[in-house]
Amino acid sequence: MGYGNSRSVRFQEDQEVVHGGESGVKLKFKINGTQINNVKMMSKGKFLKAKVLSRVFSEDLERVKTKILDPRGQTIRRWNKIFLIACLVSLFVDPLFFFLPVMRNEACITIGVRLEVVLTLIRSLADAFYIAQILIRFRTAYIAPPSRVFGRGELVIDSRKIAWRYLHKSFWIHLVAALPLPQVLIWIIIPNLRGSPMTNTKNVLRFIIIFQYVPRMFLIFPLSRQIIKATGVVTETAWAGAAYNLMLYMLASHVLGACWYLLAVERQEACWRHACNIEKQICQYRFFECRRLEDPQRNSWFEWSNITTICKPASKFYEFGIFGDAVTSTVTSSKFINKYFYCLWWGLKNLSSLGQNLATSTYAGEILFAIIIATLGLVLFALLIGNMQTYLQSTTMRLEEWRIRRTDTEQWMHHRQLPPELRQAVRKYDQYKWLATRGVDEEALLISLPLDLRRDIKRHLCFDLVRRVPLFDQMDERMLDAICERLKPALCTEGTFLVREGDPVNEMLFIIRGHLDSYTTNGGRTGFFNSCLIGPGDFCGEELLTWALDPRPVVILPSSTRTVKAICEVEAFALKAEDLQFVASQFRRLHTKQLRHKFRFYSHQWRTWAACFIQAAWRRHRKRKYKTELRAKEEFHYRFEAATARLAVNGGKYTRSGSDSGMMSSIQKPVEPDFSSE
């Protein structure tokens, strides 16, 4: 099997290829799939004839210079979607041929020539896609059934085998679907038939269109399955999937409406023929063709006959059944756009109501048509509701899961009798987590992906954020990638305490969005309070870094020297203690002085100690200055008074110095992290 960086392609032996020569001979092929001639024999010095390459893996097909297409390739995927649209257009166009017969007020039937020309052009264009599908299938490889390897299998690229397999499977169905039968019939065959052209047109259209419509309709289902197998779905979005299923339902209404129109025309003509049989002395069937309007015999008969009056549903002369509405509303003689939408509405109405409002006559064909409407409506309506529910639920499924989980949480809090403030905090956290993640479990999603893809996604999400942390801005990309892999998202609502002073620190947080308040009382010391604001790009929990850098690892986690509280909604990435140990081992590769300086500068613990140290030094400086000024004044007084004053000054010095030393002793210097190389 070939790989991305390889210059050669290894192909599996094809059991279906006829081998020439004796066994044990190795055949070599170029990268384009051609055979290297003059292959040396092992011992006999003979030569083999060229061996035809017949199988290849999918990823190697692009390297082989061949016109065979990969059934799982991007080209076939795009063509399948285009052909699916062409099939749907064809299924929409074919029933429109049923609207060709048009009835006129002169009790005659004609053919709509303009509609006939338009439908012929559109149908011919749709037939071209079916012909293209046949040609593409002859050039599309297939998976050899006995050669499946890790669920993929080898592609058979021998054109003769592909053609043989296609001819013995679905070729004939595609051929029947691609034949331009309606065009040939209405333009060539029907005009040359004996008998009534209108009768021939109606009968031929009814049988030929249905005969060719069935295979065209069944081609959609394997094509949809093939698209789903290749891409996972027919449509990329839920609304498109719902529209696709609704379109199939409308297509069924369109077909039923067209059939109802053609049957209504036949029922109207049957009434005329029945009346003509009564008036058989002066009436002939050929009078019902509009090309006979100028016939004197027809004109005299039409003036004498009352056929236009008796062939109406209200006269009770003939049973029109479910087609009486078409005669009463003069649909059969209306313009095409008007009768089409009326028939579409009739089909949709009766398909949705399962034909409950249909009042049929005693004709067996009419009753059978009503049964088909009821059965088809029941099946399609169930499929439509089920499929649309499946597609639409995909957009609201996570929201519904969150609502169920929230209901369970409310029941649990009520069962445990949590106080109102805790309940409100839980509700607030759930709401914020939903708004931030939309119910997607990011960790589970990332874990299911391959390592390389997971690393790239983590890099995209976290790399720039980690780079903004001053502690990491000097690290190389490999080390930053290692950190990004181990970062986990964390969410905090307003008022949440991330860590309290004196509690063990089990994670280090890097802030993405939001602000936190970090303060300390130096272990509860009276009168001592230090506070600072932590924002995006800052971090907290640096005590864990000192613990992780300790060359002598300790199981006990360090205690926090500060209390960190979220003052608004906060998004952050967390490094757990065990992950930080790995990151800490990478820190030792950096320059010690540079990293120590950055760590001290950005650590709030070190900032607090430095502020107290500077404050104590400033106080000592002021005391020394005050002592010098006081000593200069006392030189002008008597020695006794100077000695007394000097003694008083020294006593006050010791008292105040004791206070400064007590302050410094209470603020312990933070432990220095070990950045030395091991």
Curated annotation (Swiss-Prot):
One of its GO terms (cellular component) is plasma membrane. Keywords: Calmodulin-binding, cAMP, cAMP-binding, Cell membrane, cGMP, cGMP-binding, Ion channel, Ion transport, Ligand-gated ion channel, Membrane, Nucleotide-binding, Transmembrane, Transmembrane helix, Transport. The chain crosses the membrane at residues 82-102, 116-136, 171-191, 204-224, 246-266, 365-385. It is a multi-pass membrane protein. Residues 587-602 are annotated as: Calmodulin-binding. InterPro entries: cNMP-bd_dom (IPR000595), cNMP-bd_dom_sf (IPR018490), Ion_trans_dom (IPR005821), K_chnl_volt-dep_EAG/ELK/ERG (IPR003938), RmlC-like_jellyroll (IPR014710). Residues 607-638 form the IQ domain. Residues 656-668 have a biased composition (Polar residues). It is found in: Cell membrane. Residues 1-81, 137-170, 225-245, 386-678 are cytoplasmic. Residues 103-115, 192-203, 267-364 are extracellular. GO terms for molecular function: calmodulin binding; cAMP binding; cGMP binding; voltage-gated potassium channel activity. Residues 656-678 are annotated as: Disordered. Its main location: membrane. Pfam families: cNMP_binding, Ion_trans. One of its GO terms (biological process) is response to calcium ion. A nucleoside 3',5'-cyclic phosphate binds at residues 471-595. The keyword Transcription does not apply. Putative cyclic nucleotide-gated ion channel. Belongs to the cyclic nucleotide-gated cation channel (TC 1.A.1.5) family. Homotetramer or heterotetramer. The binding of calmodulin to the C-terminus might interfere with cyclic nucleotide binding and thus channel activation. This is Putative cyclic nucleotide-gated ion channel 15. It comes from Arabidopsis thaliana. The lineage of its organism: Eukaryota, Viridiplantae, Streptophyta, Embryophyta, Tracheophyta.
